[in-house]
Curated annotation (Swiss-Prot):
Catalytic activity reported: UDP-N-acetyl-alpha-D-muramoyl-L-alanine + D-glutamate + ATP = UDP-N-acetyl-alpha-D-muramoyl-L-alanyl-D-glutamate + ADP + phosphate + H(+)
One Pfam match: Mur_ligase_M
Enzyme class, UniProt record, top EC level: ligase
Gene Ontology molecular function: ATP binding; UDP-N-acetylmuramoylalanine-D-glutamate ligase activity
Cross-referenced PANTHER family: UDP-N-ACETYLMURAMOYLALANINE--D-GLUTAMATE LIGASE
Name the record gives this protein: UDP-N-acetylmuramoylalanine--D-glutamate ligase
EC number annotated for this UniProt entry: 6.3.2.9
Subcellular compartments: Cytoplasm
Amino acid sequence: MIPVRGFSGETIAVLGLGRSGLATARALRAGGATPLCWDDNTEARARAEAEGFACAPLKHADAFDGVAALITSPGIPHLYPTPNPTIALAMSLGIPVDNDIGLFFRSFATPDWDEFDSLPRVIAVTGSNGKSTTSALIHHVLTAAGRPTQLAGNIGRGVLDIDPGEDGGIVVLELSSYQTELARALTPDIAVFTNLSPDHLDRHGGMGGYFAAKRRLFTIGGPDRAVIGTDEPEGLFLASQLSVAPADDRVIRVTSAKPSGPGWVVSARKGFLAEHRKGRQTGSIDLRPIPGLPGAHNHQNAACAYAACRSLGLAPRQIEAGFASFKGLPHRSQIVGTANGVTFVNDSKATNVDSAAKALQAFDRIRWIAGGLEKEGGLAALTPHLGGVRKAYLIGRSAAEFALGIPDTPHEVCETMARAVAAAVAEAEPGDTILLAPAAASFDQYDNFERRGEDFIAEVAKYL
């Protein structure tokens, strides 16, 4: 645990008592503060009270008497679509609002790190898609190379749950837009922006607000080095804003296009990763044989991870060795098994159209299981990527809407995962891939995308 200093003797309100909220309360108490907690969920409050934390509704102004700050969990909206009443009240009273990510970065100014000759290096990864794989891959490569590394944030442990670590250690953080938009301190040594596509737009008031939340990672003090995916206009803009000259090597551009210019570029094209600096190739990796990184989208993730690891001084061969032993993450292009020549792939994390499109590009002869709770924008952007789909099997609340969105693709409304898997198996032929890539949220039928993926795996197991 990282004790949160700077609030000793003060009362700090904590809103939301899930994994990050409870860890925040513990870290505040360890630093000498008195947490005052609240969660609308009775069971969450009971868990906090069992650890000795006081819980009280933060509904009225007098509840904030003597409160120095409010720390909120990332899933609680503070602006769009409607501000949470407790957060709005705190803001109206002039009480600072922060989250655990902001507290983590503020902790570097406290005595807990004084014994180290060098503070931990922090790599923070954000973007619409590929954050988890990129973060986990960076962590895996660094660990395999013998670097003391911890993985936290939106993946792995809560950021305040990690240990201060070893002298010169590394912390890899996956950060969602929910986490970056409110943190009062964001000072990573290396910041990674994988890509941008429409997602969570209701939470951010539109695409501009969504990009602004991601961009904050690069504007508060600025990282020592930025790794920027430049295949979208927003990435190009961000790289341009951060560069002071064409050859500025503080910015590493990651692209699927042919490398050009005098800067530091890492490209992933047709299964090959190449590094160029000052117009010369300085490293390359054949990504095609690596089973844990299937498809062009994972090759882009690998390029981002490569750039981050090179920033820390790893040699290309060290990175290649780490890539080769990477097993991939559950629910992200996860090969579940093969039966009668049919391959089953679980990409339940493909919760938006862009990530589903990338999954569809990674495989041939697809029997596609899709649907759930449809997000803004519809399926029009998927149309160019449906050529390899033999048939779609549609599930969830938005199954009928999905059917209307893909009129030229053979499809069947199955509603449930069990029916979809059974129908796909009955019609599959050797060489087909049965792919779960929902292009939708899971909350109509499941608690989260993990449960949806686990249900797919359980249904597939009946046929293996």
